[in-house]
Regions:
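Structured loop/turn residues at secondary-structure junctions
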Residues: 14, 94, 161, 247, ...
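Secondary-structure boundary/capping motif
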Residues: 98, 165, 271, 350-351
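N-terminal Rossmann-like NAD(P) cofactor-binding subdomain of oxidoreductases
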Residues: 2-203, 207-210, 241, 330, ...
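NAD(P)-dependent Rossmann-like dehydrogenase/reductase catalytic/cofactor-binding core
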Residues: 319-369
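C-terminal substrate-binding/catalytic lobe of Rossmann-fold NAD(P)-dependent oxidoreductases
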Residues: 8, 17, 31-82, 181-186, ...
Length: 369
């Protein structure tokens, strides 16, 4: 598709942690220019640097290009914002039904929405996409536009940030050798709760064995990602059963998962080497299209023989701008076919970076024109 040289974008929820991450990612983007920053009514009308103030949690400074930008009202300026931009990224902290309604208002104002929120993840005609795994789900968008009565407006969402740490590893193998069931335990960073050690001192030297709603999301959402378009909806898969337990751990960024899994046909399961080769060689559509935020190698592999103490969060989370997945310790299991570990950067691959990559996929395929 012949694209425009530049697309104007808005960030809805610009003062929150994911919103801040969007700003740093889009600041020097080759295709996109930040045109609008929007947040709650209490931030509206202020310069961005004053609205965000001490809440700025990124390592880098607030980019000069947005520091003095006047923040718009995310809920009351929908039509104004829609006129100014080609599409918006949305990461707001509101009640679920309010988010659902807000995102539909933007879509109906003919402004595509790439959402980091969970509100529309189970709307049957809203694609929930990990760009390397199920890019074909964008083909549901014409059906969604028909329902919304729009020409170009639509909503596309990314999955929960925990999924990136375990689903890619299984999904790539599942394409060739169907996996039947898996047991997953996730060890999730505090930035997933929008916090830092400064704002959540209780997490220092602590571990919380519970994250509200997270286990259900982690078990249910993979079914939609692995589902198929049938008629005017995405029908979730019922093939791969995942059981999950989630922990909040004292780590700033990066979600890790311990995974036990078994194949439908265990007698003819692939070898450890074969699985590791599938991971290392896998190229998805983002790699084929060479999208700006696509990691050169989607899955980085550490073998049990050569690097049993890898992947470690501190080093692995930064690979390819935080967009790569790292897998290691693949070995035979006594109760399952195999066991392994996998990790990803939860606010880059798992949140803002994954949403930017999804926007790039949609742009390259002509959905933003």
């Amino acid at each position: 598709v012949k694209m425009k040289d530049n697309y104007k974008v808005g960030i809805i929820g610009a003062t929150g942690m994911v919103g801040q991450r969007f700003i740093t990612l889009l600041n020097d983007h080759p295709w996109y220019t930040i045109e609008v920053l929007a947040a709650s009514p209490r931030s509206a009308g202020k310069a961005y640097k004053d609205a965000v103030g001490a809440k700025w949690a990124m390592d880098e400074e607030i980019p000069a290009s947005v520091a003095d930008m006047v923040v718009m009202d995310a809920t009351n300026d929908v039509e104004k914002i829609a006129e100014k931009v080609d599409f918006v990224f949305c990461a707001v902290d509101m009640k679920k039904d309010e988010i659902k309604a807000l995102e539909e208002r933007y879509a109906k104002a003919e402004c595509p929405v790439v959402s980091n929120n969970s509100a529309h993840r189970h709307t049957p005609d809203v694609p929930m996409i990990i760009p390397e795994i199920n890019p074909q789900h964008i083909e549901i968008i014409p059906a969604q536009r028909e329902r919304l009565g729009t020409k170009r407006g639509f909503i596309a969402v990314k999955s929960n940030c925990s999924l990136q740490s375990y689903l890619p590893a299984m999904a790539v193998v599942n394409m060739k050798y169907p996996i039947d069931h898996a047991l997953v335990t996730t060890y999730q960073a505090i930035s997933g709760a929008g916090k830092t050690f400064k704002t959540w001192p209780e997490m220092v030297d602590n571990l919380i064995p519970y994250i509200g709603g997270e286990e259900m999301k982690s078990e249910v959402e993979p079914n939609k990602v692995l589902g198929k378009i049938e008629g005017k909806e995405i029908v979730p898969s019922t093939e791969l059963q995942i059981e999950c337990q989630t922990y909040r751990v004292p780590v700033s960024n990066g979600h890790t998962a311990a995974i036990f899994f078994s194949f439908k046909d265990s007698a003819n399961k692939p070898s450890v080497e074969e699985i590791e080769k599938m991971w290392a060689e896998y190229k998805g559509v983002p790699q084929e299209l060479n999208l700006p935020h696509a990691p050169k190698q989607f899955i980085h592999v550490y073998t049990e023989k050569d690097a049993p103490d890898q992947p470690q969060i501190k080093t692995a989370r930064e690979i390819d701008g935080g967009m790569a997945i790292s897998c290691g310790r693949l070995r035979e299991s006594t109760q399952y076919d195999y066991k392994m570990v996998s990790m990803s950067h939860n606010t880059l691959r798992g949140a803002a970076g994954g949403a930017v990559l999804l926007a790039e996929l949609l742009t390259a395929k002509g959905y933003m024109d």
